[in-house]
Structure formats: C-alpha cells, structure tokens
C-alpha cells in the first residue's frame, strides 16, 4: 500500500474518526452516497483505509490521520495519477477546515515503475569530473530584461571566474527582450569559451520550460544539438507529465536535468493546509530530476534546519528511516532509484559558505545569484570570491576544523590571500535574513 499522513483539522462537531474516514473515502473509491454500481466491484479491495489517528500536541482539534491506499488504485509510473487521487477533491471537503499532506510512504513495488532522475549524483560527478566538494552555481541577474548577448556575457564572466554552473532564472523562457534560441546560442558560446580558458567542464541551466510539451521538447532537442551538458525545467508550473517526459528524454540523450520548484510555497508553506515540500521532493525524485532547489536554512527563503535536512536526505539517500524529529513520518526505501542533488539558492553570500558547507556536505549545489553578480568589482571577481571561500571551507573541513564554530575565522583567513573575497566580505558583512519560519515541526511527545 501507499501510506499517507494527513494533518486534519475537522469542522466543529465533526469527530476525528469521521474526518479520517472521509479523507480515506474521498481520495479513493468513495462518494457522497451509496450507488448501485458499488455492487459491481469489490470495494474492500480498492478503498482507502484510515488505520490510525493521533492528536497533534499543542494544537486544539488537529490530528494526524494515517491512510493506506491499495496499490491497484494507481497507474504505474505516473506521479500525475498518484496526486490526482491522493490530493484531488478531498482538499475542498466541507467537513474539514483544513487538510495537509505531511508525508507519503511509496512502496518499493511502485517505486520500481519509475525511471526517476535521468542520471543521479555519481553519474553527474563523473560527467563533470568534479569530486570532493559542493558544486558552485549562480543565477544570472537581473532575471528579466537583459538581451541575449549581454546575458551570455554575464554567463561567461561567472564561469570564467570559477563557478561550475550558471542558471536561467525560473521565469526566463522566451520573452520579447530575449527569445529562447538566441539565449541558448549565446550561453553555449559563453560556456565553451570558459571551458577552453579554465580547463574545467562548465554548464548553464538552459530553461526548456514552455507553454506546450512540444515546444519544451523542441528547446531540449536544440540544447542537445548545441552539446551543452544540462537543461532546466520548472516542474510545478510545467506539470508532472511534462517533467517526466523531459526526464526520459534527458536520460536517453545524456543531458542533466536541473529542476526549479517555482510555485512550491503556494502549496507547502502553511502549516495546516496544502502539502509539505518533502512530499513534493519525493514526487520529483520519482518523476525525474538531477538537481532541485531545496532551500538554504541560512538565506532569504523559508526553511527550518531540521525540516530541510529531512528532505535533503530523502532526495540523496537510498534508504531513510522514520524520524519525526525531522518531519519524516515513514521509512522510505528507494531501491537504487538515483539520488537528486539539492540546490541551496536564495539570499546567500560568501559569509554563509561555512554554514552551507557544513549543512549540505559535498553532494549539493551552492548557488549565489546576487552573491556573485552583486560584487563591487564585477561578475568575474564575484565568482572568484565564492570559489576561494568554498575551497577554504572544504580545506578547513578536511583538516578537521569545525566550520560551525570557526566559519568566520576561516573566511577571514582566506580573504587575506584573495582581494576579491575581502571585498565581498566587506559588502555583505551586515546582510542577514533572521525571520522565524512559518512551517515548523510539532513538539515531541
């Protein structure tokens, strides 16, 4: 069975048992009345069952309801069908004030019907020939308004300065100021020039997201013809059907696939309604993607540390034990489905590098947009500053130093040998994003 943990807030007067049963029925075989055609099938075989209910500590009239769904309810290899059933009409149910899908346990038999990520972590490292450190990226800014030639210039400067990747922002598609084909050509020219000058393999996430699947595939095919290593997709706004289609193409044609999660906070930010990002992350690993944005803990975007590390492990590891202290409701076995590299991006700069290296480890992409292009000396010095900071943190970690305790000292030491890093530290030394997270863990029993 597929197991689901729902946070249920019933309407006043509705007992939790009735609410849990209603969720199970509405998201599987049930409807609002008994129908004659119930007798033409075996409902006991197909109906969802609410098998356990527990109150949420510290919350009045809020419960975690566990529901089991028979596997025969779902089409093989289709995240679209799985979500249509589990989070379809039930979220508008009048008997509930609010409903949130906290987690899913995907059985191994169902996991094996999915291709998953086109390549996975180890294959990506082998393609890039880069080991033993996080990868460095940069989102080109301003995100909208640059001409294709100026956009390509920024890509070149960042890659030449020492970054591994540059990135289209999520809303860069094919606008009047920069049509997609022009952007692809100038970005490809930039990364090949940077590769020749640095001797390193470089990449730029060319956003293939489009208004139709046919147009999306046309862009991905053109990227492959240019010989670039990676393309990008906005998987929530683009949709799971489009994403899975693109992931299959990327595996067949040797392209890495970077995934942006634009629109996720509409779905996952509120604690009592919607669904958590850990569910969206599991769905992405099934649908397919080699990278996905996963928050930073320390930057400008929402993300509590324990929650973030919980779904980072769900993305990367082959087997994850149940751990309610990190928001993980079920043990999950991925049966060798390739892992996904988490991307830390949003309001981060060189002073965050020790914390990011300590939190995410080696298998991550640390992506500095404003933290590269906002350098007072220009784009290339901004990239140099980030690369020096990263190399200093990795060296210090490998020497056994405590990045959490000595991070500022490590960055200051490195800045003595890098004027670019010293200038970056001076510009961003006072920049912090200290706000309480909205989505937090429940208190322990």
Swiss-Prot record:
Substrate binds at residues 89, 139, 143, 261, 293, 345. Its cofactor is Mg(2+). PROSITE patterns: RUBISCO_LARGE. The keyword Plastid applies. One of its GO terms (cellular component) is chloroplast. One of its GO terms (biological process) is photorespiration. GO terms for molecular function: magnesium ion binding; monooxygenase activity; ribulose-bisphosphate carboxylase activity. The basic functional RuBisCO is composed of a large chain homodimer in a 'head-to-tail' conformation. In form I RuBisCO this homodimer is arranged in a barrel-like tetramer with the small subunits forming a tetrameric 'cap' on each end of the 'barrel'. This is Ribulose bisphosphate carboxylase large chain.
């Amino acid at each position: 069975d597929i197991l689901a943990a729902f946070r249920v807030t019933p309407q006043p007067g509705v007992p939790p048992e009735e609410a849990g049963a209603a969720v199970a029925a509405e998201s599987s075989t049930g409807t609002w009345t008994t129908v004659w055609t119930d007798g033409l099938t075996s409902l006991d075989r197909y109906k969802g069952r609410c098998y356990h209910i527990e109150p949420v500590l510290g919350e009045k009239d809020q419960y975690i309801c566990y529901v089991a769904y028979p596997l025969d309810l779902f089409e093989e290899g289709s995240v679209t069908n799985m979500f249509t059933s589990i989070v379809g009409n039930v979220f508008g149910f009048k008997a509930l004030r609010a409903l949130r899908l906290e987690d899913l346990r995907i059985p191994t038999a169902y996991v094996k019907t999915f291709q998953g990520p086109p390549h996975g972590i180890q294959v990506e490292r082998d393609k890039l020939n880069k080991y033993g450190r996080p990868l460095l990226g940069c989102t080109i800014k301003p995100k909208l308004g640059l001409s294709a030639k100026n956009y390509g210039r920024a890509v070149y400067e960042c890659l030449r300065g020492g970054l591994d990747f540059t990135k289209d922002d999520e809303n860069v598609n094919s606008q009047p100021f920069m049509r997609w084909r022009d952007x692809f050509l100038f970005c490809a020219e930039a990364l090949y020039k940077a590769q020749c000058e640095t001797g390193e393999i470089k990449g730029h996430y060319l956003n293939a997201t489009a208004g139709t699947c046919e147009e999306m595939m046309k862009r991905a095919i053109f990227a492959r013809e240019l010989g670039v290593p990676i393309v990008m997709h906005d998987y929530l706004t683009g949709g799971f059907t489009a994403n899975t289609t693109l992931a299959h193409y990327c595996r067949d044609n040797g392209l890495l696939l970077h995934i942006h999660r634009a629109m996720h906070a509409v779905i996952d930010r509120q604690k009592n309604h919607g669904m958590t990002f850990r569910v969206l992350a599991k769905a992405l690993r099934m649908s397919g993607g080699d990278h996905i944005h996963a928050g930073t803990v320390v930057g400008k975007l929402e993300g509590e540390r324990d929650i973030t590390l919980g779904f980072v492990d769900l993305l990367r590891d082959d087997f994850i034990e149940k751990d309610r202290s990190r928001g993980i409701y079920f043990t999950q076995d991925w049966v060798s489905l390739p892992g996904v590299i988490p991307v830390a991006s949003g309001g981060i700069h060189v002073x965050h590098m020790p914390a990011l290296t300590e939190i995410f480890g080696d298998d991550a992409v640390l992506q500095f947009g404003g933290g590269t292009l906002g350098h007072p000396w220009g784009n290339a010095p901004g990239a140099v500053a980030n690369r020096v900071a990263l190399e200093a943190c990795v060296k210090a970690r490998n020497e056994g130093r405590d990045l959490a305790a000595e991070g500022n000292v490590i960055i200051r030491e490195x800045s003595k040998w890098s004027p670019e890093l010293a200038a970056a530290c001076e510009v961003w030394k006072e920049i912090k994003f200290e706000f309480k997270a909205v989505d937090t863990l429940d208190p322990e029993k």
